[in-house]
Amino acid sequence: MTVRVTTLKGADAGRYYTERLPSYYLDGDEPPGRWWGQGADRLGLRDEIDPEAFLAVMAGQDPTTGEDLGRRYGEESVRGYDATFSAPKSVSVRFARGDEEIQREVVLAHERAVEAVLGWAESHAHTRLRRRGHIVCEDAEGIVVGVFRQHTSRRLDPQLHTHAVIANRVPAHDGRWLALDARTIKLDQRTLSALYHANLRTELTRRLGVGWRTPEHGIAEIADVDDDVLAEFSQRTHDVQRRLGEKIGRFRADLGRDPTEKERWKLEREAVLDSRPAKPHGPTLTELRREWRARVRALGRGSERVIQSMIGRQRGLEGIDSGTAVLLADAAIGSLAESQSSWRPAELVRELAAVTPTTVTVDSEQLTEFLQRLADHAASTRYMDISRPAPAGMPLRRDGRPITEAAVDRALTTESILAEEEQLIAWSDRRQGAVSPHTRLLTIDSNGGLNPGQVEAAAAATSARGLELIVGPAGAGKTTTLATAVAHLHMEGRSVFGVAPTAAAAEVLATETGMLADTLDKLLTEHHHPHRPAEPSYSLPPGTTIIVDEAGTAATTKLADLARLADQHDWRVVLVGDPRQFSAVGRGGMFAHLIETHAAVELDQVHRFRHQWERQASLRLRAGDPNVLTEYERRGRLHGGTLGHMHADI
């Protein structure tokens, strides 16, 4: 993702852009900022930014009259949002190495892409206000944006990027100036990024005939820029990636798994901030271009020749026909359905932009409008709207939704997703109601060192019922409980097989419980192989107990596949996990739903900690009780300091 939105707070929030940004990277060579947006037009703000006018807007005042634009800001009030658009490195290299015409076209392509995204954001801008005792979300009549284009990174590599500073004041339909409801741009940074990159590609392809590599997560580099050139001019990226690698390594060590896409995005944001160097002063853009050319020549003639020859390869290509539009919608829906049970319309726009062919050559404004129309059409014809019903007679926004519904609250899904979830729920109902729980273990292990919760959970794991649900918080003795249950099943001559989210976790599960175990993926794959039956070790007899460890991490589709296999082979299933620990990689959430709606046993006594207070505190922390931090602080368990000091202390 290369569009990031940063919240700007405090009285000095605007000074960085007028006093420090123009000379922080280059010696006065950066262009002045300019105004953008219908909100700016309402204030008479056009063309080049006057620093005093910009500071007035960021202070929440009309630059002409000095009057407050709505409620006066407090000392720490949010003043605006910096949406930073950063071009792929190959585009910046193309700018750095091009002649005047090439540089002009690259800059225009970048600017048109930024403006197209800002136009999309403006059309979706809202404000919140109280009306008749209710908080409502109404359309804003424009936004006020200060646009500042820059050409280098903090390490003085070529890096074409733009700071679009969106003021936290928007005009409402009644003429008042109110706060921007920024939830959309904050939540949908990935949508802004996908739109920017799709538009940048179409503009550069249209203007210069540029060809592209295959996009990854919606981002693509120019095809004929060699990797060694990209690496040479990516010092800042290397800094961030090195820091990100350290963070991911610690994440894996602490949690025993890879971060999800959302978790990785958060780690990347932290890495960007942690690795940020002091801003340099110094050379002019002309001087830097000479240096950049020398660095390219030092890589060899091949890299120089590649840069000079990457123009004009894709000229003459056209737009998107109806058949391509259908394929785009299918691809976007498939991508969303893999990872989410429901999504917002903006997320659909994001996926459509990400899968837009790199050969498209329509104008960026036309492309953005097309993607929005395609998303609207898909939402009305191919999805089910599961948002809260609108009250009768409620006024509607431009998007056709009631003003009582926040823009971020609308939820869409597909019939197939709902059907899959409903089938799992029905399967769970049938499985739990079929046979009464087997309770002999309660007597057998009454003196075996287990607490009552563990005894109950072990009894459930060894029952004759077709489905059992066990909630096991960290440190609550889950492994001991399962080992006891497995021993009892073996003693009765009953088959048992364990599955875990990773091969390493499955190996630990097998070692600590004494049962055969593998990954859920492996078990499913063995029974879905098109050309051979399952391997003997996976050909489990009827009555086998399948223990699914860390069931909260299992994707819904995989649980549904397991349910079908269990019915087909007459297996019983025990789902064990903690929905408050790990989330599914992919579309999940069914384990959490099942334990809320079906009979479940919960291990409620923590054994991992030596002190009783910490056992209780860990359960409060798991439940999300913020007041438990007071207990940790009172016990001297909270420590602070710089990042370096904290690492040293650990």
Describe every region a protein language model picked out:
Residues M1-S339, R344-A353, E369-Q372, M384-M394:
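Intrinsically disordered, flexible peripheral segments
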Residues S380-A459, A464, P530:
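Pre-P-loop entry segment of helicase/translocase ATPase cores
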Residues Q423, R431-T439, T443, E456-A460, ...:
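Conserved helicase motor core of P-loop NTPases
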Residues E468-V471:
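Short hydrophobic/aromatic beta-strand immediately N-terminal to the Walker A/P-loop
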Residues P473-A474, P501:
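P-loop (Walker A) phosphate-binding loop of NTP-binding proteins
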Residues G477:
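Conserved glycine(s) of the Walker
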Residues T481, A485:
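Hydrophobic positions on the alpha1 helix immediately C-terminal to the Walker A/P-loop
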Residues M491, S495-L565, H593, D604-H607, ...:
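Conserved P-loop NTPase motor core of helicases/translocases
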